[in-house]
């Protein structure tokens, strides 16, 4: 049976283009479109779509407010369609925290001219959103309310070197999962490096958002940054990030290079470098995400002596990357998101 999609966008042009693109795939049926939240509400009640493609900026009621109502009254998997701008990034994170499964960034140019850039991604993500774990998404949104409270900022010092290192990879659902996990880290947590699949315009905003909520320092990585205790470095969008040993320190190195496992930044690229340069002093964590990026790299980390943790299926929005890692024997521990920080602390205490 085809995936039944409702498109909600105030632009008639956007509605037409999105419908034309999605209708090209035989597994997707666009059952209706709506110009605003009020028309969309009636369509949802009447048609009960499998997936809603929702524009962020709309008249009468903005996309975030409407999204919250959808999650409360008509829980349905939602794919946000947002502009790739600084403001667009902030609103997109609001949407993900409010319950959206994922997002697609609208083309910079005229949507007619730029639709080819996102056609494959749009179709792929509609299918992924349709099969996602909506109950885990709703629980994650609830957990966000209790977890993401302001915490006093620890003062980071470059003198705080780290001999242990935590490497984390995530994709779909990862922004909320990372926020919940990193909010539990303290100033004494070993240095953390993160790859979250995200466009280049979004990663700095994401890091700043986490930094305002967490005790540890969170920043978008810059080439040559030192990895230190109480510090979390997030790989910039569209750049690979690797770890290198530099005397008594670990540093990150950024570069372009080809996409690996379909992504740049790639979790596999990060994990492979951690396996080579950190070995048994590392802990690898693979969170919710579509695809297989990070699985082979995690296996290499495990082979090098690192401990490895995968998020469990029940708490994952999309159990893709962790599942593949588990299936190839790369995972030591499968944990719910709420217990991953506890497992990390336990592993660190064992290795003192």
From Swiss-Prot:
GO BP of this protein: chemotaxis
What EC designation does it have? Answer: 3.1.1.61, 3.5.1.44
Keyword Hydrolase, does the record have it?
Answer: yes
List localization entries. Cytoplasm
Secretion signal, residue range per the UniProt entry: none
Entry's transmembrane regions: none
One GO MF term = protein-glutamine glutaminase activity
Superkingdom of origin organism: Bacteria
User: Mainly resides where?
Assistant: cytoplasm
Residue span, Response regulatory domain: 4-121
InterPro entries, A to Z: CheB-like, CheB_C, CheY-like_superfamily, Sig_transdc_resp-reg_Me-estase, Sig_transdc_resp-reg_receiver
Cite a single Pfam family from the UniProt record. Answer: Response_reg
Q: Which GO terms describe its cellular component?
A: cytoplasm
Task: List keywords of the entry alphabetically.
Answer: Chemotaxis, Cytoplasm, Hydrolase, Phosphoprotein
Catalysed reactions, semicolon-separated = [protein]-L-glutamate 5-O-methyl ester + H2O = L-glutamyl-[protein] + methanol + H(+); L-glutaminyl-[protein] + H2O = L-glutamyl-[protein] + NH4(+)
Task: Tell me where in this chain the CheB-type methylesterase domain is found.
Answer: 159-351
The enzyme class is hydrolase
* Entry-annotated residues carrying 4-aspartylphosphate: 55
Which family does this protein fall into?
Belongs to the CheB family.
What this chain does, per the entry, is described as: Involved in chemotaxis. Part of a chemotaxis signal transduction system that modulates chemotaxis in response to various stimuli. Catalyzes the demethylation of specific methylglutamate residues introduced into the chemoreceptors (methyl-accepting chemotaxis proteins or MCP) by CheR. Also mediates the irreversible deamidation of specific glutamine residues to glutamic acid.
Domain notes, please? Answer: Contains a C-terminal catalytic domain, and an N-terminal region which modulates catalytic activity.
This protein's name: Protein-glutamate methylesterase/protein-glutamine glutaminase
The scientific name of the source species is: Sulfurimonas denitrificans (strain ATCC 33889 / DSM 1251)
